[in-house]
Amino acid sequence: RVGISPMTPPQVFVELWPRIQEQYPKVKFKLVPFENTPENAREILANLGQNIDVIAGIFDEAMLELRKCNGVELSREPFCVAVALHHRLAGKKVLTPEDLKGERLLMMRKGWSCYVDALRAELTEKYPEITIADFDFYNVDIFNRCENSNDMLLAIKSWESVHPLMKILPVEWDYKMPYGLLYAKDPSEKVEKLVRTVEGITK
């Protein structure tokens, strides 16, 4: 049972599916949609294994600790920037930190992730012309807010389908965040087997 929402799309399973099935032919996936709210995120991640077994998304050690779940890393996703289609930078293929000068960049609040905090520290020190604004939770609302206000949003490429009027652009910086599967601290045999299979494939 794979939990899916706009921020946690099941794309990774689509990509890995042929190889997973090759090694674990009995595996069956059931997609379980859920609404991306702070309450749901807390509830679902703390109770993985009850209604939902795995979720694909970004994470770090602090988040796993806070949410009391495990994570298996599949890749490191580069931080990108989401902009409205009518934004002055939307026509560019790749951005540089210099491009962001004079812009307002929305980033998850300090302390949410050491990876975001490291990027924030560099931008604050080297590019004071970029205004950094905090927010508390990634969901469709924050994309709507940026589309309406012309603010920029720190994002990852797999969120491209979240908002049709927003474009996700790569940036020339070397900041990434772990992306993978979140699962229960005490997983069922099936989930344990899936995790081991995925680990074997992605090594």
What are these regions (language model features)?
Residues A46-G57, F79, R145-L154:
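Alpha-to-beta junction loops
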Residues R1-M63:
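Central regulatory/effector-binding core of bacterial HTH transcription factors
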Residues L66-F79, V83-L105, V191-E192:
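Flexible hinge/capping segments at coil-to-helix
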Residues E65-V72, E77, V140-E189:
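Beta-alpha-beta core module
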Residues R1-S5, I55, A82, L106, ...:
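Short, well-ordered beta-strand segments
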Residues K30-F34, T131-F135, L169:
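General small-molecule cofactor/ligand-binding pocket signal
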